């Protein structure tokens, strides 16, 4: 790809978070766990965590009501509200030890998987009754 073509994109490395600052209020945040670099629109904020953060723990915090409250408090703009990376860095979160983050993140993953399983079972039962 030509150098000039890359200006419209951000490179996303494995184990990175990315979000649209104008759409994060509706959950527009993702995590890339692939093996190779990819590109996304330059409109997205891309970041990686430090070694003292377990990404799955942070992922669940991003999906929490507490994080939504931070977005509502810190977003800025008039017609369209934005939540840029500098505002994300202003959010306050209690960070337990990495071992505790792993336990919490894994427990929440298991709970999410259990909920998904029951939703699928309900869907199959509901559609077979009709």
Stretches found by the model and what they are:
Residues 1-130:
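Feature detects amphipathic, helix-rich regulatory segments
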């Amino acid at each position: 790809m030509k150098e000039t073509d890359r200006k419209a994109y951000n490179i996303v490395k494995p184990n990175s978070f990315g979000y649209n600052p104008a759409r994060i209020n509706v959950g527009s945040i993702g995590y890339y766990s692939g093996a190779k670099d990819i590109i996304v629109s330059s409109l997205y904020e891309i970041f990686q965590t430090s070694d003292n953060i377990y990404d799955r723990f942070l992922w669940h915090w991003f999906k929490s009501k507490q994080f939504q409250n931070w977005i509502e408090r810190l977003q800025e703009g008039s017609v369209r509200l934005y939540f840029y990376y500098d505002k994300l860095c202003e959010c306050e979160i209690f960070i337990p030890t990495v071992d505790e983050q792993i336990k919490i993140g894994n427990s929440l993953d298991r709970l999410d998987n259990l909920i998904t399983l029951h939703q699928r079972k309900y869907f199959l039962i509901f559609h077979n009754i009709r």
